[in-house]
Curated annotation (Swiss-Prot):
InterPro entries assigned: His_Pase_superF_clade-1, His_PPase_superfam, PG/BPGM_mutase_AS, Phosphogly_mut1
Alphabetical GO biological process terms: gluconeogenesis; glycolytic process
MF GO annotations: phosphoglycerate mutase activity
The encoding gene: gpmA
Domain of life the protein comes from: Bacteria
Keyword Iron-sulfur: no
Enzyme active site: 9 (tele-phosphohistidine intermediate), 87 (proton donor/acceptor)
Matches recorded under Pfam families: His_Phos_1
The protein, known as: 2,3-bisphosphoglycerate-dependent phosphoglycerate mutase
Length: 247
């Protein structure tokens, strides 16, 4: 049996301000830092250890991993960064307040933008200063690989090749893997692992900074999955994520 641990980054500055973040590279809040440290302490207390970690190229996930590994005294672990683990791109909504958008367009429309499987938000213009196509961290990508908007279906399409080509073979080789990523890149992986339908994925919310453990068989099919820590606190944290897009 293999164990895989997924963790969404701790609270970011734009989580706190209830803004659509996407590929915008915002940092953790003091609360987010403490969430990441708590995750590391919890993993250590529960006897977890890792051989390799994966994360995105966005600092809120990277710093979450740093703080988590620091608490585990594992700062020396090899870490692989990939843009494919980035958050879903929220297009022209990036930087805008979710509750304000709900007041303007209605809760139902914002829920579609936030959680539907195949409906992307309005796209950024390539000339928009928020567009990441000139960002040095994506210099090795073709322009069309740097999105102007994404739905979850698009996020799945970029996450799964990385899972299949990099992460899954590492797990099959017997290495213990930790992934620190984002709400929607984790939703993409969970959808794939658990076979969640396009309709049911709308209701899945990933809380910040709480380790999600998957026990996998030899074919990397889930035997079971669970969050570490207090179940009631985890449920409250997931409910808070769900409520972010309401007026």
């Amino acid at each position: 049996m293999h164990k895989l641990v997924l963790i969404r980054h701790g609270e970011s500055t734009w989580n706190l301000e209830n803004r659509f973040t996407g590929w915008t590279d915002v940092d953790l809040t003091p609360t987010g830092i403490e969430q990441a440290k708590n995750a590391g302490r919890l993993l250590k207390a529960e006897g977890y250890d890792f051989d390799l970690a994966y994360t995105s190229v966005l600092k809120r996930a990277t710093r979450t991993l740093w703080h988590c590994l620091d608490e585990m005294d594992r700062t020396w672990l090899p870490v692989e960064h990939s843009w494919r683990l980035n958050e879903r791109h929220y297009g022209a909504l990036q930087g805008l307040n979710k509750a304000d958008m709900a007041k303007q367009y209605g809760d139902a429309q914002v829920l579609v933008w936030r959680r539907s499987y195949d409906t992307p938000p309005p796209a950024l213009e390539p000339t928009d200063p928020r567009c990441e196509r000139g960002d040095i961290r994506y210099a090795g990508l073709a322009p069309e690989q740097v999105p102007l908007t994404e739905c979850l279906k698009d996020t799945v399409a970029r996450v799964l090749p990385y899972w299949n080509e990099a992460i899954a073979p590492t797990i099959r080789s017997g290495k213990r893997v930790l992934i620190a990523a984002h709400g929607n890149s984790i939703r993409a992986l969970v959808k794939y692992l658990d076979g969640i339908s396009d309709q049911d994925i709308v209701g899945l919310n990933i809380p910040n900074g709480i380790p999600l453990v998957y026990e996998l068989d030899a074919e990397l099919k889930p035997l079971r999955s669970y969050y570490l820590g207090d179940a009631e606190a985890t449920a409250k944290a997931a409910a808070a994520v769900a409520a972010q897009g309401k007026a």
